[in-house]
């Protein structure tokens, strides 16, 4: 069976070989986009049975859990017990993936990066930014990792705005904003500040929070033991506890929790907020010129997407080499971004993180 997805006019995706429970699972993971009747495709992924041919050269895991192998004209990426492959030239209509690849991996490792690549080739940009829609139109909330994009966006939702995107926002060539498929991850500490989210937790989410708090005792107990090995173990346990305290919320569930609609695409942004972290407990807001923030926006996006562009480096080193340089579209995005945000009001916010995101929200509203 083939599933076709129209990602808000930014790209069309076809996934073939989808059978059984994977149909429902993939449809859920692709929210808010539903399977459509469109058969034209920008990105095509064929799910296949069996194992790939033996690689002529295999580059081992470099810390991201992935290995890359090559055969003449094709690169193969292995992760967990699955794999996916792409042809020389980084052709987005010739991607294969093992049916054993976890559905969440299929979306995060294959579909979403492929859509981003197509967007960049087609004259659009994928920003490392959340986005909300309020009475004044769409607003982008951009910034480096751990700057408060998700938290600030959800604080706006608490005040009546609608969440468009979390973490990644596509700017089509016409400037329209589009949501990529994927859930929202809500940190446990955020719930003390946002009542609608706290009150809307499911039983499973509440159980996860209890488990995360219990796991959080592990690092404290282990650090009481002597030696570097105990310290290293405590650090690993702290990472696990932090991941456990992040609640995965699908778009439709978030809409039900907050009483807001699910929105997948809007017109162009009217405001762009650059969030920066600072080590003092005060918030400052200033205006910036659009042309002065382009480098920062592209740098943040490139860093967060380095796992994709890094594949080109590995594939070029392998023997036989495979050319995947087409996966890196940041130069094209840099050239396009100036036009796409030329008429957008840009402000920069410096605030501590973590903090009550309502403070950041209110500072933005007071300035604009």
Predicted regions and their residues:
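Conserved glycine(s) of the Walker
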Residues: 147-149
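Residue-level detector of anion-binding/catalytic polar loops
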Residues: 162
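A noncatalytic interaction/capping subdomain that flanks phosphate/NTP-handling catalytic cores
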Residues: 1-145, 154, 158-159, 169-368
């Amino acid at each position: 069976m083939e599933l076709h997805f129209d990602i808000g006019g930014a790209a069309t995706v076809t996934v073939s070989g989808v059978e059984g429970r994977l149909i429902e699972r993939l449809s859920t993971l692709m929210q808010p986009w539903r399977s459509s009747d469109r058969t034209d495709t920008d990105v095509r992924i064929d799910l296949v049975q069996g194992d790939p041919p033996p690689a002529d050269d295999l580059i081992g895991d470099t810390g991201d859990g992935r290995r890359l192998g090559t055969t003449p004209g094709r690169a193969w990426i292995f992760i967990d017990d699955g794999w996916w492959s792409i042809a020389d030239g980084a052709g987005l209509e010739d991607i294969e993936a093992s049916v054993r690849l976890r559905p969440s991996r299929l979306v995060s490792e294959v579909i979403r990066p492929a859509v981003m690549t197509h967007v960049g080739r087609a004259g659009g940009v994928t920003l490392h930014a959340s986005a909300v829609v309020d009475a004044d139109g769409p607003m982008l909330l951009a910034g480096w990792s751990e700057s408060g994009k998700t938290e600030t966006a959800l604080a706006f939702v608490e005040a009546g705005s609608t969440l468009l995107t979390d973490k990644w926002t596509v700017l089509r060539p016409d400037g329209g904003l589009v949501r990529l498929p994927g859930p929202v991850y809500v940190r446990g500490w955020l719930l003390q500040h946002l009542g609608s989210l706290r009150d809307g937790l499911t039983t499973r989410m509440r159980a996860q929070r209890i488990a995360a708090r219990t796991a959080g005792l592990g690092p404290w107990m282990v650090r009481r033991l002597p030696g570097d090995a105990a310290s290293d173990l405590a650090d690993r346990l702290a990472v696990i506890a932090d991941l456990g305290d992040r609640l995965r919320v699908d778009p439709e569930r978030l809409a039900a929790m907050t009483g807001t609609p699910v929105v997948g695409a809007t017109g162009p942004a009217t405001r762009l907020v650059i969030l920066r972290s600072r080590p003092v407990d005060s918030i400052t807001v200033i205006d910036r010129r659009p042309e002065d923030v382009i480098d920062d926006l592209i740098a943040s996006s490139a860093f967060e997407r380095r796992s994709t562009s890094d594949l080109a480096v590995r594939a070029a080193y392998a023997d036989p080499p495979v050319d995947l340089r087409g996966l890196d579209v940041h130069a094209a995005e840099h050239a396009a971004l100036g036009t796409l945000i030329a008429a957008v009001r840009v402000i920069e916010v410096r605030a501590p993180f973590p903090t009550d995101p309502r403070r950041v929200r209110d500072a933005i509203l007071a300035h604009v």
